[in-house]
């Protein structure tokens, strides 16, 4: 029984797809356990970029099983489109498995998402308008439609009719918006269900059987800990639990079967959307990091907000997600800066604090306390070991590990597979 969970430790976009792809080489099953197509991950193989939003990164290994777990909310339209994209690129999807218990995103979820966001005005959350939140709302309200329902024509028709009648009343009476047509949705989405039914199964059985047989299973989280609905910067969060604990709920695997948790972070910080960001940069340094790091959302295309590395955030993530190993990405983006900074604590109304407040008004008043380190000018994208890094870059990597309190297992100096450097093998340490 061997399993590793990969979680983002910041606000998403940390490079989880790259690290999952890297760790997938030694895994036999790769599974997603939460989120939906609001999460984008980019994988670079032989210089070619592949951008996925729903299908696990492990799909590029045809001999390995890729699982979309029950905790994921699935937009069948997006899934069919992504499958076609992979097929056009010559990538087989015969190794994909989709949980019959996963909930379905339908057009009324997306419309409701847009209407709710518009109604918030200046208090908007910054949602990707993918229908994720409304789909999880229906799930919690016990009126959601699951993949198993989508495949049964009569059940799908009955539940869609009931749900759509309620949603249309909401659209017309509360939002003065156009109602949606039952027949159009039913025909389109039932057809999508028939296209994906070959992949649908009880994925909890597949995952547990694999673990019981001693196979290596890798769980791939979406978003990041700071977007977790319980542990993140609520309400500026996603609607699921990206923390490692979400694995057990979203995959049907017990907590006693989780061995290691790899926290993925960048050598700086970024986030898409609104919400607190204590170390955010608004100067030319921030603009430089954004441009060099190509900080634009995979899903939205929006410019990401960027800032210095925040060890307060990272220690919070380590604690609530049980992180055992750290993967530090995008060190190369900081090359060329005379000075690099790490936030070590916050100043809250004249008092130093080492924790991340839950109160958003307090967070607004938090001022980062920085430790400054000398930067490095060298191009490090070709570095293949820690010893090859310039001394100042090595010191930066070591200091990050010290402040977070977790050993760094890998560090990356670029987006390619070959640019990920191993300091300690996660699989070998189990």
UniProtKB/Swiss-Prot annotation:
IMP binds at residues 13-16, 38-41, 128, 142, 223, 238, 302. Pathway: Purine metabolism; AMP biosynthesis via de novo pathway; AMP from IMP: step 1/2. GO terms for molecular function: adenylosuccinate synthase activity; GTP binding; magnesium ion binding. SUPFAM superfamilies: P-loop containing nucleoside triphosphate hydrolases. SMART domains: Adenylsucc_synt. Keywords: Cytoplasm, GTP-binding, Ligase, Magnesium, Metal-binding, Nucleotide-binding, Purine biosynthesis. The keyword Cell cycle does not apply. The keyword Protease does not apply. GO terms for biological process: 'de novo' AMP biosynthetic process; IMP metabolic process. Its main location: cytoplasm. Its EC number is 6.3.4.4. Disulfide bonds: none annotated. GTP binds at residues 12-18, 40-42, 304, 330-332, 412-414. Belongs to the adenylosuccinate synthetase family. Homodimer. This is Adenylosuccinate synthetase. It comes from Streptococcus pyogenes serotype M1. The lineage of its organism: Bacteria, Bacillati, Bacillota, Bacilli, Lactobacillales. The gene is purA.
